Curated annotation (Swiss-Prot):
Location relative to the cell: Cytoplasm
Entry-linked InterPro entries: SmpB, SsrA-bd_prot, SsrA-bd_prot_CS
Source organism per UniProt: Edwardsiella ictaluri (strain 93-146)
Family membership: Belongs to the SmpB family.
Gene: smpB
Name listed for the protein in its UniProt record: SsrA-binding protein
Keywords carried by this UniProt record: Cytoplasm, RNA-binding
GO BP terms, alphabetized: trans-translation
HAMAP family according to UniProt: SmpB (MF_00023)
Location, primary (coarse class): cytoplasm
């Protein structure tokens, strides 16, 4: 008898912040839970979230997500007032928060959201401690990426 594999519909990723990896060097990554309301969970299940313009602030020993947009569904409850850009609390362990506070206080470092995804039934936010890139760093990244693509193309044609 063989065991049945668990069915995983679609991708677990809800939203990605591609600008973060383009504009910053990611030094360290953390996984944070989100404190959400019911209509927000429905929006996430429908994939209607945007974290590209969002940022994270540390206040009073807690971390908060600002600027993330969760578009409410039309079928969401009518008696609940939906605020798409509401500030959401991040759920982190004390040790992780202490590490984030120490990292964010260093000169030139910030905390950016990287991706929003499902982990089992829970919505998780991957956040990173990041240092800003200069313009020449971005150009170097583009050069290496283009060279990698050209190299793959050359190798593909060389095998023919």
């Amino acid at each position: 008898m063989t065991k049945k594999k668990a069915y995983k519909p679609g991708s677990a990723t809800i939203a990605m912040n591609k600008r973060a990896r383009h504009d910053y060097f990611i030094e360290e990554e953390f996984e944070a839970g989100l404190s959400l309301q019911g209509w927000e969970v429905k929006s996430l299940r429908a994939g209607k979230a945007n974290i590209s313009e969002s940022y994270i602030l540390l206040q009073n020993g807690e971390a908060f997500l600002f600027g993330a947009t969760f578009t409410p569904l039309n079928v969401a409850s009518s008696h609940v007032v939906c605020d798409p850009t509401r500030t959401r609390k991040l759920l982190l362990k004390e040790r992780e928060l202490a590490s984030l506070f120490g990292s964010a206080n260093r000169d030139g470092y910030t905390i950016v959201p990287l991706s929003l995804y499902w982990k089992n039934a829970w919505a998780k936010l991957k956040i990173g401690v990041a240092k800003g890139k200069k313009e020449h760093d971005k150009r170097d990244d583009i050069k290496t990426r283009e060279w990698k693509q050209d190299k793959a193309r050359i190798m593909k044609n060389a095998n023919r």
